[in-house]
Curated annotation (Swiss-Prot):
Gene name of this polypeptide: rpl23-A
Protein name (record): Large ribosomal subunit protein uL23cz/uL23cy
Matching HAMAP family: Ribosomal_uL23_B
Function recorded in the entry: Binds to 23S rRNA.
Record keyword Cell wall biogenesis/degradation present: no
A GO biological-process term: translation
Family indicated by similarity: Belongs to the universal ribosomal protein uL23 family.
Amino acid sequence: MDGIKYAVFTEKSIRLLGKNQYTSNVESGSTRTEIKHWVELFFGVKVIAMNSHRLPGKGRRMGPIMGHTMHYRRMIITLQPGYSIPPLRKKRT
């Protein structure tokens, strides 16, 4: 399992870093317990709570044909005080 795809850096996610909450996009087929186990094992931290939501895909036009991108899942991971995750790399666009 790959788990986390990449970190998300938006105004809201940067504001949540002050509350020890980390935002990242994950595989859409993964569950909360899988991601929680993977984060605790890989980073050596304790997860208190996880919030997730599925974001819709975007429309993409290819000539006269209208297509769309796949939906994806975003998780907000709350850690216990005293724990932190090192900075994740930002996805290149």
